[in-house]
């Protein structure tokens, strides 16, 4: 899950009130965990998109440009590839758990992309799928089926709703689904029950991930007393990452006074012991 720590630090610096304050129903530690878990869900979906594209490529399909449109409006497709003379467009989501507003937005977005594709490809050459990877949650199947049928009727283009293995059966490679299930079962055994919020456990990699954040982010982070008192002790309980950042800022002092300012701020935090032990008030 690349850049997860970097994204979290940036969010804390920009929106500290989401993590601290009297009017939050959770303590900072719980909010950080919640943020990381939500981030994992999003990044898992992104990873599946990349993985599936690799599978399509290995199967010999021609991967096409995912960004389509012109002028000020561009649309990004989840999957699009060519097999023989057929163009496959797939709108891919992990699970069918959308509420009424999101499911309507999903269909609207799907139609908009089909409309854009029809300006590039012929109706008869297109096969368009709404695909939910997880077959265990089928919340809006009736709605999506009805809406896809309407799109098929109005645009005269092939549309299909698929869950889990169904997509791979559509492209005549069900063995890929079985391989994916086997991989996921092994992966689930390896991953921890909960993500670690002690970034000092992997200090070097954490430092490498966050060191190039904009200096304005670090400035916001280190100038906020509540963040320094309530958040940094949770993320950096042993000061390992903070010490690496301090060394890094000192090495860059010749590039601007802001780096001296940041170095002084970090040294102040370390010397006060605000990162010495987790504070989970």
Task: List each model region and its residues.
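Interdomain/boundary linker segments immediately adjacent to catalytic/signaling cores
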Residues: 1-59
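Short secondary-structure capping micro-motifs at structural edges
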Residues: 39, 67, 75-78, 113-118
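A short acidic/basic microdomain associated with nuclease active sites
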Residues: 53-73, 79
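Secondary-structure boundary elements
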Residues: 58-62, 83-86, 119-126
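Secondary-structure boundary/capping motif
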Residues: 66-68, 89-93
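Active-site beta-strand-loop-beta-strand hairpin of nuclease catalytic cores
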Residues: 73, 80-90
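Catalytic cores of nucleic-acid endonucleases
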Residues: 93-154
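Non-catalytic C-terminal interaction segments of nucleic acid-processing enzymes
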Residues: 150-281
